[in-house]
UniProtKB/Swiss-Prot annotation:
SUPFAM superfamilies: YozE-like. NCBIfam families: PRK13672.1. It comes from Streptococcus suis (strain 05ZYH33). It holds the Pfam family YozE_SAM_like. HAMAP family: UPF0346. This is UPF0346 protein SSU05_1322.
Length: 71
């Protein structure tokens, strides 16, 4: 079974970075309702679009998801 997107994303945290993946990781870390156990693109994407308390570029998310799938 693939590790959750959130678990992988937390390995990308870097508060000093301006890279989109590091920014999303910091946002997700602070978001209590982030789907932490999910490895499903639709579930995470829907959360970001509809429920997140922050705004994030979905095109950046798509690229980050591709990186996640590659690991």
């Amino acid at each position: 079974m693939r590790r959750s997107f959130y678990s992988w994303l937390m390995t990308q945290r870097n508060p000093k970075s301006n890279e989109p993946v590091a920014i999303l990781a910091d946002y997700a870390f602070d978001e209590s309702d982030f789907p932490k156990q999910s490895d499903n693109f639709d579930e995470v994407s829907r959360f970001l679009e509809e429920s997140a308390s922050f705004a994030f570029s979905m095109s950046d998310f798509d690229a980050i998801w591709e990186d996640y799938l590659g690991h």
